[in-house]
Regions:
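Active-site-adjacent structural elements that line small-molecule/cofactor binding pockets in enzymes
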Residues: 1-131
Length: 131
């Protein structure tokens, strides 16, 4: 089951900033040839970025590693932006055959994380019709 970061924000680029460090840490685990997250980036067409992330991390440059995570990669693998964009992302996962998502809400506090999950729940809730 895919684990998907979710950040609700009017600005998708700003939302992406909240998860860059998280993604960089996973891409930097272990060696290039054996890291599934590095391989995911390579397979998605972001091999040079994945290598830069690992190089920066190996040099202790964690801020640079996070900055090297491309928005385009995050936009394909996370739910970022305002509620309508989050809903469209969830629909894209469903259209690809995903039936269950494990969401990882990124927010500064528990209320923000709960609000992000509420946005996701509203996106998948069946629409009620009035008789």
């Amino acid at each position: 089951m895919p684990s998907v970061p979710i950040v609700v924000d009017d600005d998708p680029e700003r939302a992406a900033s909240a998860v860059r460090g998280y993604v960089a840490r996973f891409v930097s685990l272990g060696r290039r040839g054996s890291n599934i997250y590095h391989r995911l980036m390579v397979d998605a067409g972001f091999g040079a970025a994945a290598d830069r992330i690992q190089d920066h991390t190996a040099a202790g440059e964690h801020t640079a590693a996070a900055a090297a995570v491309p928005f385009e990669f995050l936009d394909r693998t996370a739910l970022l932006g305002p509620p309508d964009r989050i809903a469209a992302g969830i629909r894209a996962y469903a259209d690809a055959g995903v039936t269950t998502l494990a969401l990882s809400p990124f927010a500064a506090d528990p209320d923000g994380r709960a609000a992000a999950l509420h946005v996701a729940a509203k996106a998948v809730a069946p629409t009620r019709s009035t008789p």
